[in-house]
C-alpha cells in the first residue's frame, strides 16, 4: 500500500479535513477517532495501511 502524507487542514466536530502534502489530490474527510490522539489543525501525518501517525 502507498504511503501518504497529510496535514490536518480543518477540524469539523468529530471529523477532520486532511490535505495531501506529497502530491495534488482532493481533501480527505475522516473521522477524528481514526487519527492519533492530540492531532489538531496543522498536525502533519503519515498514513500507511490505513494507520495514521504524527510526523
Where on the chain are the PLM-derived regions?
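Structural detector for short beta-strands of small beta-barrel domains
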Residues: 1-12
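Residue-level signal for tight coil/turn positions that link beta-strands
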Residues: 12-13, 49
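Short aromatic-glycine-enriched beta-strand elements
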Residues: 14-18
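Beta-strand/loop nucleic-acid-binding surfaces
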Residues: 25-37
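Short nucleic-acid-contacting surface segments enriched for D/E, G, S/T with interspersed K/R
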Residues: 34-47
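Short, Lys/Arg- and Gly-enriched loop/turn segments at beta-strand edges
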Residues: 49-55
Amino acid at each position: 500500500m502507498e504511503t501518504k502524507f497529510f496535514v490536518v487542514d480543518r477540524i469539523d466536530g468529530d471529523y477532520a479535513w486532511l490535505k495531501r502534502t506529497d502530491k495534488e489530490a482532493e481533501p480527505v474527510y475522516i473521522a477524528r477517532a481514526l487519527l492519533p490522539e492530540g492531532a489538531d489543525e496543522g498536525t502533519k501525518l503519515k498514513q500507511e495501511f490505513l494507520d495514521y501517525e504524527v510526523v
